[in-house]
Amino acid sequence: MKELFAALLLGAVGTAWAQTTPAGLWKTIDDETKVEKSLVRITDSGGVLSGKVEKILTDKADAKCVECTDERKGQPVQGMTILRGIKPDAAEKGTWVGGDILDPNNGKIYKVLLKLVDGGKMLDVRGYVGMPMLGRTQTWLRVE
């Protein structure tokens, strides 16, 4: 009985931790059309987050980033790293900043701010130029 309780407790702690970090699999939703676009896996490497397109959910699964201007130019969007260099915001718990996000539709790179909402079930992803108030936000849904 004690072993079962300990296993349940450890499982609950793991679930609680997973909800306090953006690391995991997210379904992206287009902020204009509300269409599900892709699955993005966010990983944490030494406190720095990055995100890779794991699967494209539209009929454009073979899309390439033709407008990209860096090493991603002409590369398949599926498997591409679109989030890079993101770190926890020391001033605001539940927020990550300092990196960038690529919009593979137009090849543009924006500064990015990530914020967990609804107990970690959703992630507000704000891409911007200059200041965060000069940008737009997509809300992604946690898959795992």
What is the predicted function of each stretch?
Residues 45, 117-119:
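Structural motif
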Residues 20-37, 136-144:
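K/E-rich alpha-helical interaction surfaces of small helical-bundle regulatory domains
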Residues 14-18:
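Sec/Tat signal peptide C-region and signal peptidase I cleavage site
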Residues 112-116, 131:
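Exposed beta-sheet edge/beta-hairpin loop segments within beta-rich domains
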Residues 4-13:
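Sec-dependent N-terminal signal peptides
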